[in-house]
Amino acid sequence: LMAGMAHLPEDRRREIGRDALTVCRQVAEDEACGRTPRRMCPLNTAGRCGLHSHRLMICRLHGVPHELRFPDGTVSRGQGCPVFTGRFPDRDYIPFDRTPFYRKLSALEQEFRKAAGLDRKFKMTIAQMIAHDPDIQP
């Protein structure tokens, strides 16, 4: 993500930084009022990612049908976004079990955290990652 940001012109980085700070403020306000935050990613420009070639895995999978199997046996399924489902009108559901990929990703994260001596989890949105980056000055 940050490697992609580094390739952008400075004025665009500043604009994204301002947008990220705005999104973070809006999310905090939503949460303070008991609302579920639903805010657009600060990298979004006219429905497209401004860092398309550097986007995160979760972004690459957005809109694709999914299936997740939880340890308690429950299964969560999503059919995907209308653009995806519109390409396959004759199919009610296209199975894509992400569980093995997320397990591998979790194992990689644990391995990295152990090697780096990190003892806490980091759960940040893209807006938060950008807003907390000292190299991004709005």
Where are the language model's segments positioned?
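Short loop/turn segments that flank or connect secondary-structure elements
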Residues: 2-138
